[in-house]
Amino acid sequence: MKKYLAITSKGLENLLADELIALGVTDPKVVHAGVKFEAPIEVVYRCCLWSRIASRFIQILSEFDVRDDMDLYLGASSINWPSYFSADKTLVVDFNGTNREIRNSQYGALKVKDAIVDRFTKADLARPNISKVEPDLRVHMRLSGEKGILGFDLVGSGLHQRGYRTEAGRAPLRETLAAALVMRSTWDESKPLLDPMCGSGTLLIEAALMACEMAPGVKREKWCFEALNDFDAELWAEIRSEARVKSRRGVKKVDARFYGFDRDYRVIQTARENARRAGVEDLITFDVGDATKVECPEGFENGVILCNPPYGERLSTEPALIALYSEFGRQLKEVFGGCTASIYSSNDDLLACLRMRADKQFKLNNGALPCVQKNYSITESAERKEAVSIEVAPEFMNRLKKNIGKIGKWARKEKLDCYRIYDADLPDYNAAIDVYKDYIIIQEYAAPKTISEDKARRRLTDMIRATVLVTGVETNNVILKVRQKQSGKNQYQKLAEKSRYFDVEEYGVKLIVNLQDYLDTGLFLDHKLTRKMLGEIAAGKDFLNLFAYTGSATVHAACGGAKSTMTIDMSRTYLEWAQKNMNTNGQTGTQHQFLQADCLQWLQQADGEFDLIFIDPPTFSNSKRMEQTFDVQRDHIMLLENLKRMLRENGTIVFSNNKRNFKMDEAGLEKAGLKAKNISKQTLPLDFARNKHIHNCWIITHKED
């Protein structure tokens, strides 16, 4: 008997071996990402037609050592290729793997092709043509270290191409992988199956095909083994005919029901089309639905929930997934008690959010991505246990509830859309949580090096889950950012090109924020009282805003009746943002000026006069566009001396900065002819009361003679 290699995904080797035994193979041998076996051609044909989890079947022609390209050529040349196929057949060489000498798969494929063609030429036969588009034959060369396997791919295009799927939803599963997940899910034909995040319906369709005893390759038109000299057309026709009859009978006798839900109506339409092409549309009910709200269908008491939720490769960029898994887990326990669930994901942290203990788990790659499938029993006892311990991170939840009760009431009274509800109150949960209208930003501070990465991630996961539970915020409206000590060029780091702008209200003023594109949002929440104060004292005054950022202080001053405003920042992006802020509040006209400039340089040569000046410089800056470094502790007197030249006799400078333990140089200030009053306490809002050093703020005026 001839030798064969069945190829599959890593982690499915034993499952494939069992499947091949059921199809008539004896003594299969498991190898890495495959199974080797010997079998008569009838069994091989059945395996190609009926295997649900093999991706390819290779007829092994030779196994040989490959140290270099000469070994490769000689090994391929040793095969009597004309005895296997005729020269009128087109072919392509698929080369997989490299070693120290053969580092390029295209080069390896070329050497094998040369050996095949040369063998025909030496036999005085025509050269077979090479075709990369639908060739009659595919020659398969697999190289692992110095060991090579050379043979024919009996299938052609991968066996996952069943013929029923032409398009898919997000990140579709290969059909072979989907079939494996069904096999390991605890589902059998006696049970109903539900996929609450079904996408294009692949999991349900594969299960329905199993229930119908429909061969996965029955709709496939082309097989590469048909181009081989020893192809038995009569035997193959008999095996295919038998499979078609079995499929038709199977559809009629199936009692199992299948249910698929997805939030995207267009994806549901695609799933219905896929089921129709697969011939199982009458068995599957597809509907638009939210996995976190899905109800148990009638007669589903012993059913199986199987799904492949979105899992994202980076937890830090997908906080909504934490909330999704948390709510989904709660829904499973509340609605599907007595059923079983099988969830496939690459992220153990997300699976932990389900708050369920797996009975069994299987490691199984999705392509190159390591993933795991976990099976859960959703028992009544588990449901009661969850009811007792429904709170996640109870200490954190209790603090958050308390803060929201106090700060939320104050914010509503003050007419504030944006405020902080948590500011690293508890040492184990080191983050700031801000409300921006209907959105919540969780700003995680970098964990100390003494805390393990796994523990830090688990605490972050718990924080996000608890925040969603306490606030009731929509999961897609949770945004996660990691905050670290900022310096120089990453002070206002751009994050992504999502461009999500919207208006918020602050003491009757409308301001534009952007929660996605930058590390900061366009609004420093700790300065809300400072901005309010500026608006209250700006009437009839010429106002200057330096290091203006998005100009929110200018907007308050203008809305408070300022005679004129000058807004200066080095960033064109922020100046344009400031102009939009002003326009949103109807503050237009030539009395409102905007200037892109290095504020430090501008101060050295400016000669205007102002009644009210607001300056909130960075603690430290070494921007490439600034000609010098700036340190607010070292340079604040120089800064204020320059401002004094432009300050009218009864004018006021509101000077603020965020340097912890900042000390005003009172002697230097007096020498400069200025005096200062510390108003930090008056400008510290309730939502920042715990962080008394978030900023310091001063009223600077001319010293009286």
Curated annotation (Swiss-Prot):
Main subcellular localisation: cytoplasm
Tell me the compartments it is located in.
Answer: Cytoplasm
Gene3D superfamilies the UniProt entry points to: 3.30.2130.30, RNA methyltransferase domain (HRMD) like (3.30.750.80), Vaccinia Virus protein VP39 (3.40.50.150)
A GO cellular component annotated for this chain's UniProt record is: cytoplasm
Q: Does the keyword Cell membrane apply?
A: no
Catalytically driven reaction(s): guanosine(2445) in 23S rRNA + S-adenosyl-L-methionine = N(2)-methylguanosine(2445) in 23S rRNA + S-adenosyl-L-homocysteine + H(+); guanosine(2069) in 23S rRNA + S-adenosyl-L-methionine = N(2)-methylguanosine(2069) in 23S rRNA + S-adenosyl-L-homocysteine + H(+)
E.C. no? 2.1.1.173, 2.1.1.264
- GO MF, any single term: 23S rRNA (guanine(2445)-N(2))-methyltransferase activity
Q: Where is the THUMP domain?
A: 43-154
Keyword annotations for this protein? Cytoplasm, Methyltransferase, RNA-binding, rRNA processing, S-adenosyl-L-methionine, Transferase
Family label: Belongs to the methyltransferase superfamily. RlmKL family.
Stated role: Specifically methylates the guanine in position 2445 (m2G2445) and the guanine in position 2069 (m7G2069) of 23S rRNA.
Q: Which HAMAP family match?
A: 23SrRNA_methyltr_KL
What is this protein called in UniProt? Answer: Ribosomal RNA large subunit methyltransferase K/L
Which organism is the protein's source? Aliivibrio fischeri (strain ATCC 700601 / ES114)
Q: Which gene encodes it?
A: rlmL
